[in-house]
Every structure is written in structure tokens, then in C-alpha cells.
Amino acid sequence: MHLNSSVQQGAPSEPGAQPFPHPQFGLETMLLALSLSNGSGNSSESILEPNSNLDVNTDIYSKVLVTAVYLALFVVGTVGNSVTAFTLARKKSLQSLQSTVHYHLGSLALSDLLILLLAMPVELYNFIWVHHPWAFGDAGCRGYYFLRDACTYATALNVASLSVERYLAICHPFKAKTLMSRSRTKKFISAIWLASALLAVPMLFTMGLQNRSADGQHPGGLVCTPTVDTATVKVVIQVNTFMSFLFPMLIISILNTVIANKLTVMVHQAAEQGRGVCTVGTHNSLEHSTFNMSIEPGRVQALRHGVLVLRAVVIAFVVCWLPYHVRRLMFCYISDEQWTTFLFDFYHYFYMLTNALFYVSSAINPILYNLVSANFRQVFLSTLACLCPGWRRRRKKRPTFSRKPNSMSSNHAFSTSATRETLY
């Protein structure tokens, strides 16, 4: 990707490099829009002629490659999340699920689906192919960034809430029966969406439509860009990074590590005792003592699989979201004087890579999180078989294996179906 000289930074460059004139509005204003969005990559450049200096000259091969990747992610993500939503909408399917994990999966599927439907088409149009003018009006500009940020917050918080649900179900199963009632889970998820909307409200006042043509009248100069000062936008970026990445990542990492350690201990105890009996202890006085769970050899393998899934959840979240937020924070912590021609070009290619990873998260979540719940996975595959006759025929050819429920001795009544759900 090569940028027109009128938008390059006049910072000190490497020896032998030709310096570029400092634009009228400065590089920082241009980077604001890039750092905030999946949208208009050139939205706040200073221009003399709207149809020349606003252009970011991405080579056609990069455009085609990014478009192909986006389309593949769009198809996989929309199909996976739509089937998940359809599965959860079936009353018969819900009756076969014993825990509240399906509420969290449904909320996550909805936020991922909205990200793919709302953000990806706009980005392909207004950043990859047509950089200017902004075609959706001032209300569309503000609404786009508001909805996109709200769905981003919702996805991150839904991933964290799912980790909380799994932690309670596995490490505190008796307490979970009380805390994770259906009504409380619905209220909790509703609170997540309300908080996500409130956190995204600043975008309604941060972004707006401006005409950056030389005379302020040329229709080709309309761009969706930050309309507030640089310091305010930096605060918005930093708050977004903390609430949509650092905070959820902390919860996910800690809780999934605790769960993985618990499952690992159960596997080791089962292996040592030979007959597959493990003891899960709790420190709560209400739950007191311990209970023994007889684990068959096949279930030991399932526990190991559960540990791998938990680690994959953490790794996927970090890999897909960390580069995206690092790219946005580049604007906050790199001064105008530090931007060179090479760094500026790197930023734009890095932009495409990080946003692709951002969408990978929404596309793989239906696959990754169906591994979290064995019961939900069975219902999901059953729904897919109903929607796809070819898939139904392949499933009929596969041998079916019956799995005996885990035996359990305790002073408390606890359903074996819930135990299977808890242990994946």
C-alpha cells in the first residue's frame, strides 16, 4: 500500500529518504479514524482535491486477497452463528439442555453475527475499495460506530461471562445450581448488553460527518471522522481497550486456568486410583466435605479434551484481539515525530491483518464454543442435520456410541446429566 505524498508525515526519516511535507490537518487526525474503526481508512486526511489526495493506494492484489478472506469469514461466521441462534430458538432443543450455558452461547452468537453483518460490509466498501466519500450520511456514520462498538463490547463480555458460567458449573457445582437459575442468567445477559450499549454511547458524539475538501463543498470530500479533539479520542480508545480486551482477558485467563487445573487434578486422581474415582473438594461450609465421582476410562479422555478446549479459548481470544488493540494503541503512544514513511505503510498493512483476525474471532466462536458443551454440541449437530440433508446422510452412516452416565455418591442430589454438561 502506498500513500500519496500529501498525507505522509514530515517526521525525520531514515538517511537518504525524501522528507514529505506536513499536511494541513496533520497525520494524527488521519490516524484517529484509522485507530477507531473498521471503516474509512483515510477519513480525516487534509486534501486539496478530494479524488486524489484522499486515496490510499492499496494494490489490487491486496484488495482481492483481503476481500476473499473477508468473504470466507463472512460465510463461515454467519452460517455458524445463524445455526446456533436457530438451534437455541427451538423449544425442543432447549428442553434437552440442563444448564444455562445455552443462554451465554446464544448471546455470544448474536453479538458475533451482528459484528459480521454490520461491520464487515461497511469496511469492505469504505476502506478496502471505495475510500471516499462516505455514503451513509451523518446518522449512518455515528450509528455505524455506535453499533459496531456495542457489539464488540458485547462479544468480549459474553466470552467472559461464559467463562464465569463454566467456572461455577465445574468448580462450585452445588452453588451453581442456585446462582445460575434461568431467570438470573437472563437478567445477567441483559445487563451485559445494556452495559455494552452504554459503553458505546461516546461514539455517537466522537464520530461525525465532515467535508475535508479544499473549499469544504466538494461532495467527494465527505468523510466519517472524529469530530472531537485528539485527547478525547485517545481516552475513548484506551477505555475501549481496557473494557473490551484487558478486563475480559483477565477474567478468561484466571477462570479458565483454575478450571483447567481442576480438571487436570481429576484426571491425575482417576489415573492414580486405577478404578477411576476422583474426589472434588469444596471449601464452602454449605457444600462441606467432598463427593466422589466415578469416571470411566472414556471420561478421562474427555477431561483431557476439556483442558485443551479451555486453553484454546484463552489462546484464540489473545491471538484474535491483541493485535487489533495494539494497532489502535499505536496512535495513543506514538507521537507525530516518530512516524516514518515505513512505519506509516506498515500501519496500513497491519490494519488489514488485525481487522481480519478480529473477524476470525467472530467466525470461529461457534466452532470453539460448541466444544464447551457436549449436550449443546449434540443439539447443534442435530439442527444442522435437519437443515442440511447431505449432512444428515453422513451422520446416519457414522456409528453411534452410547455413553453411560457418571456414577456419583454425595450427600446432595445432583443430576448426572448436569454432571456430563459440567465436564464437557
From Swiss-Prot:
Topology of this chain in the membrane:
Multi-pass membrane protein
Q: Where in the cell is it found?
A: Cell membrane; Membrane raft
Q: Extracellular side: which ranges?
A: 1-67, 123-142, 206-234, 331-348
Q: Tell me what PTMs the record reports for this protein.
A: N-glycosylated.
* Keyword Disulfide bond on entry: yes
| Chain spans, region Disordered | 398-424
Output one GO BP term. Answer: D-aspartate import across plasma membrane
Q: Which cysteines are joined by disulfide bonds?
A: 141-224
UniProt-annotated stretches for the region Neurotensin binding: 326-349
**Keyword match Repeat:** no
Ranges annotated as biased composition (Polar residues): 403-424
List the Cytoplasmic topological domains: 89-102, 165-184, 260-308, 370-424
Q: Where is the lipid attached (S-palmitoyl cysteine)?
A: 386, 388
- Record GO terms (molecular function): G protein-coupled neurotensin receptor activity; identical protein binding; neuropeptide receptor activity; protein-containing complex binding
Which GO cellular component terms are attached?
cell surface; cytoplasmic side of plasma membrane; dendritic shaft; dendritic spine; membrane raft; perikaryon; plasma membrane; symmetric synapse
Residues passing through the membrane, by range: 68-88, 103-122, 143-164, 185-205, 235-259, 309-330, 349-369
Q: Where is this chain primarily localised?
A: membrane
UniProt KW keywords: Cell membrane, Disulfide bond, G-protein coupled receptor, Glycoprotein, Lipoprotein, Membrane, Palmitate, Receptor, Transducer, Transmembrane, Transmembrane helix
Per the UniProt entry, the glycosylated residues are: 4, 38, 42, 211
Role summary: G-protein coupled receptor for the tridecapeptide neurotensin (NTS). Signaling is effected via G proteins that activate a phosphatidylinositol-calcium second messenger system. Signaling leads to the activation of downstream MAP kinases and protects cells against apoptosis.
Q: What is known of its domains?
A: The ligand binding pocket consists mainly of extracellular loops ECL2 and ECL3, as well as transmembrane regions TM6 and TM7.
Q: Describe, as the record does, how this protein assembles with itself and its partners.
A: Interacts (palmitoylated form) with GNA11.
Family to which this protein belongs: Belongs to the G-protein coupled receptor 1 family. Neurotensin receptor subfamily. NTSR1 sub-subfamily.
Name by which UniProt lists this protein: Neurotensin receptor type 1
Q: Which organism is it from?
A: Mus musculus
Q: Which gene encodes it?
A: Ntsr1
